[in-house]
Amino acid sequence: MTTISIGEPTVRMTQEERSEKSRQQILDAALKLFSHKGYGATSVRDIAEEAGLSKGNVYHHFPDKETIFRGLLDRYFQAMSQPDFPFNRALAEGSFPENLEGIGNAVREIVRDYREYVALIYVDVVEFDGTHVRKFYGDMAERFNSFMKAHGMEKELEGKLAAGLSPVSAVMLATRIFYNYFTVEILFGVKDHFGKDTDAAVREISRILRHGMLKPNA
């Protein structure tokens, strides 16, 4: 008598699901290789081997290596546009510039969790002269402006800033300073490069951004 074991039903992936899974495997493998070896030193064969797929499978999903590279940057930029992206959440939930520490900590989370994607930006600058990231940075002020208007931040911030200062410039400046700080700390591996621990540095940077570095007038 044959015994039939009845367990969990087998879940079969559709062709579309299998194809998408392979595509993501390729992108994940390329991210690891591009961010550590660079673009030029990584071949399509390297990506296929890292992904556990054939070279033909890679070409089935992507016509060439540069398309994979662009796909990774697009993946990162798409994540940055989501409401739950740490920076967007911190900016929307707080009141600028009172929430500068929160923004700094959000940027720390981003550079830590998206470290390999941040590295790709440097790869693009070195190996492509910034071709793939130029438009993203060129459109940055417009994106900040749209975000702040959508969340009703612009008018409120105008009332807090010194005369003639742009709310968009103020938020962008603070953001870029924190990105620079955490890129050096996390991506370059230079701990406490302001001569103090990270939390203390975030507090001091926030204080300088809010109040300036000079003593108030007597």
Predicted regions: what they are:
Residues 92, 98, 108-149, 194-195:
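Short secondary-structure transition hinges
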Residues 36-40, 114, 158-159:
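Short coil/turn segments at alpha/beta junctions that flank glycine-rich nucleotide-binding fingerprints
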Residues 14, 21, 25, 29-67, ...:
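Helix-turn-helix
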Residues 74-80:
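Short, basic, alpha-helical segments at the C-terminal edge of helix-turn-helix-like DNA-binding modules
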Residues 85-116, 121, 167-174, 202, ...:
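Hydrophobic alpha-helical connector segments
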Residues 118, 134, 138, 153-207, ...:
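Hydrophobic/aromatic-rich alpha-helical bundle segments in the mid-to-C-terminal region
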Residues 1-21, 88, 217-218:
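N-terminal intrinsically disordered/low-complexity leader segments
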